[in-house]
């Protein structure tokens, strides 16, 4: 049997209990992991998953560092780590400007903020043992930082054609470390109608293409022409053209 992928799982109001039932089913089906995006409360969902599952690995992917105080993050992460018997991975990131603005928050400098957060997290007193810390990374400086201070990293929508170049910034020892986690969240639509599936994914990726961080990554990955065309469409408020690119 081929290795099963991990699944992204979010809990929305009114369906939280059903989501936990689904987590149990995901484990029974043999999937390799459950990762909770920043949609909703990924820490609360992870805490519940720790208690309803037995063996599957799971984690946040990601928990924005600005949403809570560092000590609160450390306490919750340690609790989940302990109650899951080490199955939890604490994925963190800076999120995106529009998402922070919607919550009345303002981000800072991604690299220095992540470095400070991880340092303070590890120094938090009397919280207990911490889980592996996974950094959300897209571009090379954050990837290098993950290799320096983290236990892994997670991409989102990363191009396979650019992956080798991205990973080349890691040290040889980090690349060989089986405990260093490398993940890539990929929106997936399964259908016998290939064109319909493509249309769904284009619609899904449109929201990512609206964000500067992703466009900058895709430019680095070689899609300069497409990203510049999208930027022109955004500037002209011709949003319906974005899926075309």
What are these regions (language model features)?
Residues 1-245:
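Active-site-adjacent structural elements that line small-molecule/cofactor binding pockets in enzymes
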């Amino acid at each position: 049997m081929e290795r099963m992928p991990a699944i992204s799982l979010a809990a929305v109001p009114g369906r939280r209990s059903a989501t936990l039932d689904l987590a149990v089913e995901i484990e029974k089906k043999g999937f390799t992991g459950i990762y909770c995006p920043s949609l909703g409360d990924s820490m609360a969902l992870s805490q519940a998953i720790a208690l309803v599952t037995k063996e599957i690995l799971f984690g946040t992917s990601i928990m924005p560092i600005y949403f809570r105080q560092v000590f609160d993050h450390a306490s919750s992460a340690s609790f989940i780590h302990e109650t899951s018997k080490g199955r939890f991975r604490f994925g963190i990131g800076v999120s995106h400007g529009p998402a922070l603005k919607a919550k009345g928050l303002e981000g800072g400098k991604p690299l220095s903020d992540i470095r400070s957060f991880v340092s303070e997290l590890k120094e938090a007193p009397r919280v207990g043992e911490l889980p592996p810390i996974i950094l959300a990374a897209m571009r090379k400086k954050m990837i290098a930082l993950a290799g320096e201070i983290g236990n892994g990293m997670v991409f989102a929508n990363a191009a396979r054609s650019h992956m080798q170049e991205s990973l080349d910034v890691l040290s040889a020892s980090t690349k060989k470390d089986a405990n260093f986690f490398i993940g890539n969240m990929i929106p997936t639509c399964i259908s016998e109608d290939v064109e319909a599936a493509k249309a769904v994914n284009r619609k899904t990726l449109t929201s990512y293409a609206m964000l500067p961080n992703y466009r900058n990554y895709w430019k680095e990955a070689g899609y300069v022409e497409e990203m510049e065309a999208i930027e022109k469409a955004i500037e002209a408020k011709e949003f319906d053209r974005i899926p075309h690119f």
